[in-house]
């Protein structure tokens, strides 16, 4: 059953919070506009993992595609370890699946953080509240590159400055350098990894 809600909101994360509020299921998987599932069985695999292992969070890999649906950037994530956020790490937000009850316990997205609201929420859930998580090494979602969070370098820089303040490391020059160093290395690797993928278009997958 699909329920469509159309009304005024105060930005993307305010709209997402409304969706979470109206959702009736136990798990929340946020599929953004223009994104699509990489394969038609991925939801079944995620649900099975929740049933068998009962984690609070499951996340996976994300594939950015260009306008022709060809691989452009492959975000292969990794198992979460404490303090990884301080090295510029985070799960790919479009793959972040958690129980609806966690939004009630620990709060939803804070719109005031702008485009950094997604990382702040994942940081709050994983680092601060120590929710159990499982990294499923599968590609969950294909995402068109060039969305609001990847608009330009200035936008990306602003996001990262906000994150440094959220992580409370913005006054420590050593931690700032470490944050950007690891983030840059990881970003370059994502583009290199995408080159290794099959050049086959991905728009034939489940949407």
Language model features by range: what are they?
Residues 17, 44-47, 157, 161, ...:
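Generic alpha-helical structural signal
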Residues 1-152, 195, 199:
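Nucleotide-sugar donor-binding/catalytic module of glycosyltransferases
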Residues 164-207:
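Membrane-interface aromatic/basic loop that binds lipid-linked glycans or pyrophosphate carriers
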Residues 119, 124, 146, 157, ...:
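Short, surface-exposed, charged/polar-biased interaction segments
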Residues 138-139, 151-174:
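Catalytic core of nucleotide-sugar-dependent glycosyltransferases
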């Amino acid at each position: 059953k699909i329920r469509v809600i159309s009304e005024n909101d105060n930005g993307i994360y305010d709209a997402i919070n409304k969706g979470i509020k109206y959702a009736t299921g136990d798990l929340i998987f946020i599929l953004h506009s223009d994104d699509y599932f990489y394969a038609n069985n991925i939801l079944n695999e995620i649900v099975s993992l929740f049933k068998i292992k009962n984690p609070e969070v499951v996340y996976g890999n994300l594939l950015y595609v260009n306008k022709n649906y060809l691989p452009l950037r492959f975000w292969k994530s990794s198992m979460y370890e404490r303090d990884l956020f301080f090295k510029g790490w985070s799960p790919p937000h479009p793959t972040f699946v958690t129980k609806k009850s966690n939004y009630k316990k620990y709060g939803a997205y804070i719109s005031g953080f702008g485009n950094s609201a997604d990382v702040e929420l994942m940081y709050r859930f994983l680092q601060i509240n120590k929710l159990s998580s499982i990294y499923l090494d599968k590609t969950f979602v294909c995402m068109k590159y060039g969305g609001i969070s990847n608009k330009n370098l200035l936008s990306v820089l602003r996001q990262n400055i906000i994150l440094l303040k959220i992580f409370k490391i913005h006054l420590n020059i050593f931690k700032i350098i470490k944050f950007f160093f690891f983030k840059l290395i990881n970003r370059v690797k994502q583009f290199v990894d995408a080159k290794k993928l099959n050049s086959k278009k991905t728009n034939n997958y489940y949407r």
